[in-house]
Structure formats: structure tokens, C-alpha cells
Amino acid sequence: MVGMDLFKCVMMIMVLVVSCGEAVSGAKFDELYRSSWAMDHCVNEGEVTKLKLDNYSGAGFESRSKYLFGKVSIQIKLVEGDSAGTVTAFYMSSDGPNHNEFDFEFLGNTTGEPYIVQTNIYVNGVGNREQRLNLWFDPTTEFHTYSILWSKRSVVFMVDETPIRVQKNLEEKGIPFAKDQAMGVYSSIWNADDWATQGGLVKTDWSHAPFVASYKEFQIDACEIPTTTDLSKCNGDQKFWWDEPTVSELSLHQNHQLIWVRANHMIYDYCFDATRFPVTPLECQHHRHL
């Protein structure tokens, strides 16, 4: 009987793993992504893929599938040296004018000055929810991991698994939350010298082109959907690992990490910008330290 009980237990675990393992994880670039524009500026070197920006074009890539909830991660080494005027982005987005979007935007700077990481969130086409911070390392010398963890409870932006921003689901407070549109995963590099560096005061020096961002360790552990209109596979009663409270909510240690990031590296938070928002956005009233 003990042997039979053990067998049943193992089979139940296997069924659970299968039901929650419809995600896609760790793969080569071509398995998860494809060039979305300027194919000659997107170079797949096997383990590493590079996006190049010159005075002719930037470049970008996109995921082959769309997803509803899960975790996407990528390792990026940003443009070395003088990157002023350039923006490298890693983000998730749905389609259409009323789209949802989660953004990492890396704003280039002059040599010796720190990169600025800007995060932004769009829900139903409404954005303008920027936060900016300086990193606690040089992101141009080595690869670092940037992740977005998206569940029904929250959206968490992470750098090397350290949370830097959390957006909780506060629909019960009347605050919209991104939960009903499938998203693709994207990255791109482009010239944004009208605003990216010191408010547009520093322009791109094309004598330093090409500007190259490098990528590796492509991971998408998320619920892949068959069509953008059929979301039942991913938002029904079925439970995935990211639905567990121990995953979708920050631990005590992660909360301490987030507080440390905000205290030591945050340089802008839209919640405290009274010029842009004379009336404090509703979600800011409920995210005291987020």
C-alpha cells in the first residue's frame, strides 16, 4: 500500500507540473524571438544577440508568441562609452491604442556618467507613470538580468532579482490593472536625443556609432496563448506558479531590497511630481513605499 500511495503521489505531482508547465523557458534567441525591424542591425551570434544603432537606423526584436501572466527575463549589456542620446528598451506590450505595457528604458549618458533606468506602466492606453533610478553597478561592463514578473496580483520589475518597482492590483480601489490583454515581449535601440539625456540637452555623437546593446540568456516562463482573443487558457481557474502568494507578493527581504533601492537610487517618481500631477494619482495613495 505504501508503494501504491507513493506512486499516486508521484503521478499527482507529474500532473500538476504538466498543468502548470505550459510556459516556455530558457531557449535560444531564434526559438523565442525574431527581428522586428532593421534586420541588418540585429545580429545573432549564437549565444549573444546584438542590436546596433547608427545614423541610418536603430533595431528591434519581438517574441514569436504572446503571453498572459508569467515571468520574462533577459540579460543585457548596455552600450559602452558615450551612449548619450540613445535609448535601449526591454518591455512587454499588447496591441492597439488601449494597450497595456510594462517598460524598462535605459537612457544613455556621456562617458563616465551613469545610465538612468526608467520604468513605465500603461493600462488601457494610459501611461505617464514613470520612475527613474540609477543602478548600483555599471551596466555596460557585464551582463545583468532584467525581469518582469506579471501575475493577477501584481507587476514586479527586477534587476538581478532585486525588485525595483511593484504595481499591485488595486482594482477594488477603482484603479485599472493590466490583466485582460495578451502581451508580446520586445526590445529595441533607437535615437532619442530630443529627450533621453539631460532632457535633450546632450545630443547623440554619431562619430561613436555604431552603438551596440548585447543580449543573452533569453527566458520566457509564461502562459502562452493561442490567439489574442482566447485568454481562457491563462486567466481561468487553472493555477500557475506565479499565482502563489509567496511568488506574486514580495517577501520581507524583497521589501527591504525595494526600500533600499528607492532610498539610495531613485531619482524621479511621478507620484511626487506635483507639476505634472497637481492631484496625486490614486494608485500613489495606496503605494506608500512602492
From Swiss-Prot:
Q: Which InterPro entries match?
A: Beta-glucanase/XTH, Beta_glucanase, ConA-like_dom_sf, GH16, XET_C, XTH
Q: Which sites does the entry annotate for glycosylation?
A: 55, 109
Q: Which residue ranges does the record assign to the GH16 domain?
A: 27-215
Its Gene Ontology cellular component terms are: apoplast
Pfam families this protein is in? Answer: Glyco_hydro_16, XET_C
Task: List residues binding xyloglucan.
Answer: 105, 118-120, 128-130, 194-195, 199, 276
**Gene Ontology biological process terms, A to Z:** cell wall organization; plant-type secondary cell wall biogenesis; xyloglucan metabolic process
Post-translational modification note: Contains at least one intrachain disulfide bond essential for its enzymatic activity.
EC annotation from Swiss-Prot or TrEMBL: 2.4.1.207
Give the function comment from the record. Answer: Catalyzes xyloglucan endohydrolysis (XEH) and/or endotransglycosylation (XET). Cleaves and religates xyloglucan polymers, an essential constituent of the primary cell wall, and thereby participates in cell wall construction of growing tissues. Involved in internodal cell elongation.
| PANTHER family registered for this protein in UniProt | XYLOGLUCAN ENDOTRANSGLUCOSYLASE/HYDROLASE PROTEIN 8-RELATED
What is the protein name given in its UniProt record? Xyloglucan endotransglucosylase/hydrolase protein 9
Species of origin reads Arabidopsis thaliana (Mouse-ear cress)
Q: Which gene encodes it?
A: XTH9
